[in-house]
């Protein structure tokens, strides 16, 4: 999206249970 970095973090948190 417009902020791929933020989306990447979002994906990571969803997958890894919010670090």
UniProtKB/Swiss-Prot annotation:
Keyword annotations for this protein, in alphabetical order, are: Calcium, Gamma-carboxyglutamic acid, Ion channel impairing toxin, Ionotropic glutamate receptor inhibitor, Magnesium, Metal-binding, Neurotoxin, Postsynaptic neurotoxin, Secreted, Toxin
- Annotated residues for binding of a divalent metal cation: 7, 11
This protein is called Conantokin-Pr1
Q: Which domain of life is it from?
A: Eukaryota
According to its UniProt record, which protein family does this protein belong to?
Belongs to the conotoxin B superfamily.
Q: Reproduce the miscellaneous comment text.
A: The mature peptide does not contain cysteine residue.
Q: What is its main location?
A: secreted
Its biological purpose: Conantokins inhibit N-methyl-D-aspartate (NMDA) receptors. This toxin has highest potency for the NR2B/GRIN2B subunit. It induces sleep in 10-day-old mice when injected intracranially, and hyperactivity in 24-day-old mice.
Required co-factor? Answer: Ca(2+); Mg(2+)
Free-text comment on the cofactor: Adopts alpha-helical conformations in the presence of divalent cations and is unstructured in the absence of divalent cations.
One GO cellular component term, please give it. extracellular region
Where is this chain's protein located in or outside the cell? Secreted
On tissue specificity, the annotation reads: Expressed by the venom duct.
- Please tell me whether the keyword Protein biosynthesis is annotated for this protein: no
What GO terms are given for molecular function? Answer: ion channel regulator activity; metal ion binding; toxin activity
Q: Which residues carry this modification: 4-carboxyglutamate?
A: 4, 7, 11
């Amino acid at each position: 999206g417009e902020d791929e970095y933020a989306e990447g973090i979002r994906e990571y948190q969803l997958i890894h249970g919010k670090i």
